[in-house]
């Protein structure tokens, strides 16, 4: 399995992972909020993400491949550059460190439960370390003895972050699948 940054030459693979009805879906804009450029230009979410893929550092996401097939996506942003996340009333901002924040994992049907999310997490951590980020944080759920509903597990499972060396910092007021989301962090 290979994990690569979402770059403009990989845009068709980004569309494969996030696409479908191009006017619906998050397109990894939920935490970012609509920036001033998007508002002024009247961009759609896919147009905004395409611009971010071209311009953003770090890229707004990472893609997982098995052979030539794109099988996963991990949405990434930087705390301090994500207006909706930074101003969230349910997920607190711990400090002013520009840690990389993992917002979501999307794994194609047929590839789930095969280590794709774990590979994406490792790839993002390695990229953050190489870029000199002070840390990586995420907001997963802990289903505690039950299987998480796949529709709500997009935030990741706490056990995966535990295995990757993240520490559980606190339980947030945010929920997914009626479970509280944790704030987990790995200092780099």
Q: What label would you give each PLM region?
A:
Residues 1, 12-16, 35-43, 47-49, ...:
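Charge-dense, helix-prone N-terminal extensions
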Residues 2-20, 24-25:
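A short beta-loop-alpha structural element at the N-terminal edge
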Residues 26-61, 171:
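Active-site rim helix/loop that mediates acceptor-substrate recognition in acyltransferases
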Residues 56, 65, 69-112, 148-155:
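Conserved acyl-donor/pantetheine-binding loop and adjacent beta-alpha core of acyl/acetyltransferases
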Residues 60-62, 98-100, 178-184:
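Short beta-strand micro-motifs in enzyme catalytic cores
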Residues 104-107, 113-130:
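Conserved acetyl-CoA-binding loop-helix of GNAT-fold acetyltransferases
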Residues 121, 128-152:
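Conserved GNAT acetyl-CoA-binding A-motif
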Residues 151-164, 170-188:
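C-terminal "cap" of GNAT-fold acetyltransferases
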């Amino acid at each position: 399995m290979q994990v690569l940054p979402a770059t403009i030459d990989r845009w068709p693979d980004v569309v494969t992972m996030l696409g479908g009805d191009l006017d619906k879906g998050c397109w990894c804009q939920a935490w970012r909020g609509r920036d001033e450029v998007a508002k002024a230009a009247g961009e759609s979410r896919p147009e905004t993400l395409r611009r971010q893929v071209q311009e953003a550092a770090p890229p707004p996401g990472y893609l997982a491949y098995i052979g030539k097939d794109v099988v996963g996506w991990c949405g990434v942003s930087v705390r301090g550059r994500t207006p909706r996340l930074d101003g969230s009333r349910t997920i607190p901002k711990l400090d002013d460190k520009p840690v990389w924040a993992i917002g979501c994992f999307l794994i194609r049907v047929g590839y789930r439960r095969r280590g794709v999310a774990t590979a994406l997490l490792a790839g993002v951590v390695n990229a953050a370390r190489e870029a000199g980020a002070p840390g990586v944080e995420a907001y997963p759920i802990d289903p505690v003895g039950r299987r998480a509903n796949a529709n709500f597990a997009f935030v990741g499972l706490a056990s995966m972050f535990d295995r990757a060396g993240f520490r559980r910092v606190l339980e947030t007021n945010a929920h997914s699948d009626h479970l509280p989301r944790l704030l987990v962090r790995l200092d780099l």
